[in-house]
């Protein structure tokens, strides 16, 4: 199993501490929407019945949200479930995987019997036209991308993305595009989402998730959108017959219409992310611009920063488990202002104490 953030149970077992301020998982700190809680209470009345194996109500709601056909949508037990089921039924032979990226892509490809060719992106870990050249010169039948990227938060330029999709289409190559962080901020226009391109590129499948933006990772709800309805049906029939439980389906329908929470989250992130980025930069860290609800930064020579922060009850995502990254890189979720202040205070204490190998990078007050 791949390593992930948000594993507070393991942290508790290893340290004996039960209370954590978790910056390792990219979950909305605003908490579970009231609309979800209400939907779950109402849906509990139907738990004596099997869930709809076709998720008809949910797919209609998603289709209306994204302006696609319900037949172009497949729902699952989180975004990872869609990724695994898609690759399991596709069975690609040779995939190009730009790294660093979400670890489950390689795990899903490997499980599907595919040979994975890692394309190591040099710092600043940005997709460039070299990927198009690799596709043209290599022998691949699958390409996996994430936009925005996890863990960097960077995005692919729209013109370049179009070129990549055109190249893949010409080479008859399947493209799996993970957009699970795409709807986090207003700076990414929905018309540039790959969802708008599924009819022009039937070899493209876009993965989305409701987990992070609405703080419901425990419910597990993800979906894939593809212009090829036969492929969607193939994916739907791969795996168990009830991939989405009743509570998750009703909760998803509720949040899709919860405009107040959506606005509240975007307003929060619009203010909190630059504030946290500014604070990290003032401490001397190299911080990447992000289009998601997390920040990727480099703490040169500080390979135990995550462990040092545990003394303050703070969990930070160490990125040394991502292919292409070493022990200098970390990822921090954007949380509430008072929580972000605790992270910055903890980092400052670590730096002042020389807890990270004596690194001298403290530049200013936070």
Describe each model-derived feature in a short phrase.
Residues 126-139, 151-175, 179-213:
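Active-site pre-lysine segment of PLP-dependent enzymes
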